[in-house]
A protein has these predicted regions:
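FIC/Doc superfamily catalytic core
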Residues: 1-111, 115-226
Length: 226
């Protein structure tokens, strides 16, 4: 049902991105709303609205693959910083993985994050004069690189991974088929290639959660001069 809702609204979401004068945080929210309005009553609302007191994470506590996402009050900061990087065409090409990592770390929504930020990222790449061959990526390799990017944002891990898939600019008429051919987005898998596994929520203001946020904040993602 969710895949059907997503695929039926995909063309409309792509068209809205195409005609947007600029890509902003509001654009990200609108893209999510367009894609999932038939499935989630909260489509287009970020976690600051839907779950302002919850911490969202992925993976087992203590695992090397444990990923802590941005706290609700900082979601817009993370997305805006990624958009600021992307506004410079040269930086967008060099730091395509950094931008995607910031969007993924922000994790604006309770569900549908990966598919939403994929579309936004594709549009940003197009405006910067290149494309990424997402259908050539492999789900597990990509998600591992993405998790490592979030946990170690200064190492350029996802930049290095995505450089292998940078292509000349792709015609917009090809985007729909390209997206639906990405491993996991063709409707044959119960888990989306861009929305991996189950996320666990906790109360954001507990000492444990605050310690985790402090550890993430120490990684200095948001530099004054990116």
């Amino acid at each position: 049902m969710e895949h059907l809702a997503f695929s039926s609204r995909l063309e409309s979401a792509l068209k809205k991105l195409e005609v947007s004068a600029e890509i902003s945080y509001a654009t990200v929210l609108e893209t999510h709303r367009t894609l999932f309005q038939d499935f989630y009553h909260w489509a287009g609302q970020d976690r600051l609205i839907t779950t302002p007191d919850k911490e969202i994470s992925k993976g087992d506590v203590g695992s090397d693959l444990r990923t802590e996402f941005e706290r609700p009050s900082q979601i817009k900061l993370a997305v805006d910083y990624g958009l600021r990087l992307a506004s410079d065409k040269e930086k967008m090409r060099a730091k395509a993985g950094t931008v995607m990592g910031l969007f993924a770390f922000a994790h604006p929504f309770l569900d549908g994050n990966g598919r939403t930020i994929l579309l936004v990222h594709m549009e940003l790449c197009f405006r910067a004069g290149f494309s990424i061959a997402w259908a050539a990526t492999r789900k597990n390799e990509y998600l591992q690189a993405l998790s490592q990017e979030i946990n170690s944002p200064d190492e350029g891990i996802l930049d290095s991974y995505l450089k292998n898939f940078i292509n000349p600019i792709a015609n917009r008429s090809e985007w729909l088929d390209q997206i639906l051919n990405i491993q996991g987005l063709d409707g044959t898998s119960s888990i989306d290639a861009m929305d991996d596994k189950v996320y666990v929520a906790g109360i954001a203001n507990t000492p444990e959660m605050l310690d985790r946020y402090t550890a993430q904040a120490a990684k200095s993602r948001y530099k004054t001069e990116p």
